[in-house]
């Protein structure tokens, strides 16, 4: 399982602007992180669906590349199955909104959070506690969602 990926910078992408990844912020291809970042600089309240309790695992783009390389270097033997959960942190939608609001306000954007009716058919509160130690044990050096990492996006 891979959690939603955020971030734009990788060692390779930083070499040339043509290597930058896509930045989707829409409801279909985008992540809530990107949507909140765009809303914050556009002066639109961060729209939290329902109570904002929807929790997911998140992964920095740099870590996605590390995970693929680590899994490749530690491939399963014939007849063996290895499954790695690709995530480094979990956040609820409300936690992400508060995190991005704080960063945007520190940068001078007057950001607010607005709860709207959830347009999705999903449980807003659920048990979610995924194990993600496998890749850490293989040597994953996580890049966590810090204030600085959000500013760089």
What does each of the following model-derived ranges do?
Residues 2, 16, 22-27, 126, ...:
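Histidine (H) residue identity feature
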Residues 3-59, 80, 85-87:
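A conserved pocket-lining segment of Rossmann-fold NAD(P)-dependent short-chain dehydrogenase/reductase
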Residues 40-151:
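C-terminal substrate-binding subdomain of Rossmann-fold SDR/epimerase-dehydratase oxidoreductases
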């Amino acid at each position: 399982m891979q959690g939603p990926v955020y971030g734009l910078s990788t060692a390779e992408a930083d070499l040339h602007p043509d290597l930058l990844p896509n930045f989707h912020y829409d409801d279909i291809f985008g992540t809530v992180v990107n949507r909140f970042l765009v809303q914050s600089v556009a002066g639109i309240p961060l729209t939290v669906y329902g109570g904002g309790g929807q929790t997911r695992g998140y992964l920095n783009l740099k870590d996605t590349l590390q995970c693929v390389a680590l899994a490749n270097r530690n491939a399963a033997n014939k007849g063996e199955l290895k499954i790695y959960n690709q995530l480094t942190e979990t956040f609820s939608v409300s936690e992400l909104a508060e995190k991005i609001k704080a960063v945007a306000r520190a940068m001078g954007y007057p950001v607010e959070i607005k709860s709207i009716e959830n347009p999705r058919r999903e449980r807003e509160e659920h048990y979610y506690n995924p194990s993600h130690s496998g890749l850490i044990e293989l040597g994953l050096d996580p890049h966590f969602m810090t204030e600085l990492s959000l500013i760089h996006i």
